Amino acid sequence: MRLPSLDIDSWCLYSAEAAHDTLPDSFSIPSFEERNGLTRGNAARLLFDIMVTDEQGERRSFQEIMWTIIAERVDGTYIGILDDQPGCLEPRSNNYLIFGAEIPFLPEHIIEIAYPPGDYSDWQLNLNPERCWPR
């Protein structure tokens, strides 16, 4: 499965592993075993790089940390449902990144793990995704 890229999608995910290797004392991440063992309904926090065209027509890069609720895993790739709205984007029809969009990611992208209440995860995962990532 293809992962997002700035060139194609105008957004991508930073590697939490690379960030940790660069700044091990100030950027901690869960163990690989924890990041690799998540299941449906668990939450994973990811670091996004988002390209936005400003009012002057200039392209600018914004970084946002957002949560996803894991829906499934396909051939080693997690598919999470975005559980945040990017602050740098308007929630309109031409933006892929909106609350409820499918987000593909790998264990290397996870910066934090949470275990939301089951009723919340069930609610989020029983909705149809607002955006579906190509399989």
What is the role of each PLM region?
Residues 1-135:
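Mixed-charge, low-complexity intrinsically disordered regions
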